[in-house]
Amino acid sequence: MKRALIVMPLLLSLYAGAQELYVSTEPASNMPAHSLGIRMTSRFFKMEHEGITGIRFEPEIMWGVSKKLMIHVAGLASNQMQSSIEPEGASIYAKYRFLSKDDLHSHFRMAAYIKGAVINNPFYPQMIDNSRKPYKNAELDLEGGASGVAGGVVATQLIHKLAISGTLGYNRFMNNTKNRLPDEMSANAVNYSLSAGYLLLPRTYRSYEQTNLNLYVELLGKANTDAVSRNHYLDIAPAIQFIFNSATRIDLAYRTELFGNMPRNVFNTFTVRFEHNIFNVVKRKG
């Protein structure tokens, strides 16, 4: 009984903001304090240069340090830049919620985040034969593209079953462990996003064991700011999400470009994610 009284508020808080669990971005809200999350993300994408499907696996561990601070640690493995699926490096992400205004059926939150990555990929894919298209890519990221750091702010508004969130961030790309950042690639970029999530089911909440069905649409933009490669793009990423027992979720998302002038090796990505959360890992004393 005591355990139920402790865990139930955590599950209720997760349910109340279930439509904030965006697939392509992070909300300003955090996971419950002292909770542990295990996540596996698989991405499938057509590589324009090779004309074949690339795959990236991202195992991730998440920890709710407190109600205001959470940390993610992720590994990366892919065949995007290597001849086969190889480890690419790792990243660490931290988010601190500095503003929270809660009402009965709504809340507004703001948070700051920082991310760092160490990547061992080359900046140009390994050549196996000469039958491929010329490699044209001006997009870098911290998910296998380049080592570097990023930081920014997130604001999220929840109103009943609808959650709207916006992100503005700065990225500084650096040399990879074995390769120098090419002079023709921008070392600086700005990222921005606008995300909406809607809780479709259940229509009436009766138990934390009910399955949640959430629908999302996210606009994801990036602009390189260095004069050597000043270009931009805006993508759209619709997604569907299932949450079971308020602790386990499955995400399905598709991302494609709306418009832009940035040369890219990948324009379309299909994402499958599995996540499981364990609440109250560290029990309170007394």
Regions found by a protein language model. Name each.
Residues 42-46, 75-81, 98, 114-120, ...:
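Transmembrane beta-strands of outer-membrane beta-barrel pores
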Residues 18-61, 119-123, 133:
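Short glycine/proline- and aromatic-enriched beta-strand/turn motifs that initiate or cap beta-hairpins
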Residues 26-33, 68, 100-110, 161, ...:
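Short loop/turn motifs that connect adjacent beta-strands in outer-membrane beta-barrel proteins
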Residues 32, 53-57, 85-90, 143-149, ...:
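Residues that define the transmembrane beta-barrel architecture of outer-membrane proteins
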Residues 83-189:
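Outer-membrane pore/translocation modules
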Residues 91-94, 194, 266-286:
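Outer-membrane beta-barrel "beta-signal"
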Residues 29, 42, 63, 96-98, ...:
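Residue-level signature of outer-membrane beta-barrel architecture
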Residues 38-42, 73, 94, 110-114, ...:
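Membrane-embedded beta-strand positions of outer-membrane beta-barrel proteins
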